[in-house]
Amino acid sequence: MAAPALSWRLPLLILLLPLATSWASAAVNGTSQFTCFYNSRANISCVWSQDGALQDTSCQVHAWPDRRRWNQTCELLPVSQASWACNLILGAPDSQKLTTVDIVTLRVLCREGVRWRVMAIQDFKPFENLRLMAPISLQVVHVETHRCNISWEISQASHYFERHLEFEARTLSPGHTWEEAPLLTLKQKQEWICLETLTPDTQYEFQVRVKPLQGEFTTWSPWSQPLAFRTKPAALGKDTIPWLGHLLVGLSGAFGFIILVYLLINCRNTGPWLKKVLKCNTPDPSKFFSQLSSEHGGDVQKWLSSPFPSSSFSPGGLAPEISPLEVLERDKVTQLLLQQDKVPEPASLSSNHSLTSCFTNQGYFFFHLPDALEIEACQVYFTYDPYSEEDPDEGVAGAPTGSSPQPLQPLSGEDDAYCTFPSRDDLLLFSPSLLGGPSPPSTAPGGSGAGEERMPPSLQERVPRDWDPQPLGPPTPGVPDLVDFQPPPELVLREAGEEVPDAGPREGVSFPWSRPPGQGEFRALNARLPLNTDAYLSLQELQGQDPTHLV
């Protein structure tokens, strides 16, 4: 019965044996610590510590890279009661055996009888666990009583980070320990240091270590071998404080400079003497500008001063006043046109009266400077009729029965000079188109009556309403009312197809400014003028009417 029972239990024990071995290995790894560092060239140093390690057991570290064909093994040597260490030599000291992409599998193997037992395992990334070799070749370059210059070298450092290094140094003074020594940090690759504030004739020791800036688990290298040096003794009778002499020299120079400047400013005889010393040859401006020198007595400042007061150049002054635009009815007296101080009365726009205006832009050409060029005011005259278009029959029948508009009285005094009409010759020069009509207008004696100048309704119906009037010309000072230059009634009747008798021998030819217009002429003019609701004439419109004369 015992044999059958053992037969089915044996396969079960074989299956459970690997599991028991892995549990034992995990227990061993849980109480051990395995740490390795790469020196960036061809050396991997490892330290393994184990609690309750077996006595008289040999252990070793085996390295197996994933991208290389070689493998290396080193014997762990005891460094303390529970720790061992070894160095994996991968090749020549300065050869680059590993790169940043390599991963090395490290195992700690211990012998148990005739078999090797795995005690620890690690996937090692060389450039994430860097520790360089300690600096070498420390030497004193220069030593004085209070300072010392020391240099060193770095061995077996990879070219991957040879420019990305930092250093720490410490100096051991008498009566202190290395742990108490202050650390001096160099954040760049600087293989020398200048120690200051040292005591003369004193013995010191110096150490330095290095660390690359690359790697997550990178650590400082071991401290270098101590370098002992001694400062020079101080000379007899010499001040032991070096900065005091420099301070005295600086203060003496500053006081001397201040005294020299004071003497140069306050000494009256310094000017000619200084010119002779500096050999300054300044020319006399009076030799070249004799007229200015005689006018201002040799004062150069008056030569360069402005002839105008400073207020003339002030941008904050009052702006020049601009002449107002006045619009008055034709029936108003002329004196109201030039009263600038008073506000003009609003014109009552009706369908029976035309309006006239006089605009002057004298204010635009006013200057404050005494030598400025004065420009004479330019006057612009224009008319407009704001009434709406009426029926010709109703217009004739509804003509005002009152007296005809009386001509305005001529101006006098300053007002007459302000807004006057041009002379006959100037008017012809200003608007030569007055002579370019089909024939000069003719007037009959007694033309002032309204009934004599009025046309029959039958003739008024035949007159075209969109007839374009001739260019306007300003009247003479004797007749200030502005009347458009129009063809005579005979010409209008001929165009309408009616027979009109020729003028008698007593009917002379005259221009429209030679007689006062009648009421019928105003009505005929108003009936022919197109509706114009604009109250202003621009400069371009004036030039368009008469391009030979520019305003």
Curated annotation (Swiss-Prot):
GO biological process terms on file: cytokine-mediated signaling pathway; immunoglobulin mediated immune response; interleukin-15-mediated signaling pathway; interleukin-2-mediated signaling pathway; negative regulation of apoptotic process; positive regulation of phagocytosis; protein-containing complex assembly; signal transduction
Keyword line: Cell membrane, Disease variant, Disulfide bond, Glycoprotein, Host-virus interaction, Membrane, Receptor, Signal, Transmembrane, Transmembrane helix
Segments carrying motif WSXWS motif: 220-224
Signal peptide: 1-26
Membrane topology: Single-pass type I membrane protein
Region (Disordered), start-end ranges: 389-416, 432-486
PROSITE patterns found in the cross-reference section: FN3, HEMATOPO_REC_S_F1
Stretches assigned to the Extracellular side: 27-240
Start and end residues of each Fibronectin type-III domain: 134-234
Summary of the function given for this chain in its UniProt record: Receptor for interleukin-2. This beta subunit is involved in receptor mediated endocytosis and transduces the mitogenic signals of IL2. Probably in association with IL15RA, involved in the stimulation of neutrophil phagocytosis by IL15.
Domain notes: The WSXWS motif appears to be necessary for proper protein folding and thereby efficient intracellular transport and cell-surface receptor binding.
Name of the protein described by the UniProt record: Interleukin-2 receptor subunit beta
Lineage: Eukaryota, Metazoa, Chordata, Craniata, Vertebrata
